[in-house]
């Protein structure tokens, strides 16, 4: 991934992911031994972690840090759901599901809990001397996608490349989307819930743009949000570049 100055993001240092509970032994071997994973940042709420805990006991070499972007009361539709609760919500939904998700993104970037989490996220990025850092939420696209937006922007990656990376979520989500769609179809709910299904399980340009526009409206630019909102000064951005670019 190339920056506007022609530098590149170092491979195997910055990793975004969905929940980790289903990691195989081989997955853990690759992350710990090949990627030299040293820190995992969990952006989910306590309740989400209880439902799908990280495999901490299987990765003793790794430090796990909990940085919830939402409070329990605010997490709403981004909360971990089973298929039946998803179907119930989708069948009762009256508002445009894409609009619902778009409205979540500004809060997930600018909310008090989110700002607190992203400040600590950058502290960890600045403090880690070696090895990889992995951050994740439940699906790996909303909270995790915004964290990726922030670090990549801070490193000077152009917006179109950041968007391309964000939308790559849809490639990796196809298997899950097919499985959930099959459950909908089996229970004769696909026609009623298919749009909502796509809205909540896929990445859309409008989602990330909604967050960026909210930051620009409040701070003037994403750069100003980084500096004024999160305390990422030009000096800190230079340190990040030294660590994660070549």
In which residue ranges do the predicted regions lie?
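Cys-dependent protein tyrosine phosphatase-like superfamily
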Residues: 1-134, 147-246
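Ser/Thr-glycine-rich phosphate-binding loops at phosphate-binding pockets of nucleotides
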Residues: 139, 143-144
């Amino acid at each position: 991934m190339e920056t506007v100055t022609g530098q590149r993001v170092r491979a195997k240092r910055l990793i975004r992911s969905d929940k980790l509970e289903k990691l195989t032994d081989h997955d853990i071997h690759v992350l710990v031994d090949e990627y030299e994973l040293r820190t995992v940042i969990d952006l989910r709420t306590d309740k989400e972690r209880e439902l799908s805990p990280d495999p901490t006991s299987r990765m003793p070499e790794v430090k796990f840090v909990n940085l919830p972007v939402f409070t329990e009361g605010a997490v709403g539709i981004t909360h971990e759901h089973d298929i039946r609760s998803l179907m119930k919500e989708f069948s009762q939904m009256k508002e445009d599901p894409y609009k619902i998700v778009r409205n979540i993104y500004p809060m997930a970037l600018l909310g008090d809990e989110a700002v607190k989490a992203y400040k600590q996220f950058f502290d960890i990025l600045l403090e880690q001397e070696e090895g990889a850092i992995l951050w994740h939420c439940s699906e790996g696209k909303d909270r995790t996608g915004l964290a990726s937006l922030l670090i990549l922007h801070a490193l000077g990656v152009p917006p179109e490349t950041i968007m391309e990376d964000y939308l790559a979520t849809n490639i990796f989500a196809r298997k899950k989307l097919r499985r959930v769609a099959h459950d909908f179809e089996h229970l004769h709910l696909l026609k009623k819930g298919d749009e909502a299904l796509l809205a909540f399980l896929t990445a859309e340009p409008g989602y990330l743009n909604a967050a960026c526009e909210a930051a620009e409206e409040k701070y003037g630019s994403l750069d100003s949000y980084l500096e004024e909102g999160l305390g990422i000064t030009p000096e800190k951005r230079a340190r990040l570049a030294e660590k994660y670019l070549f």
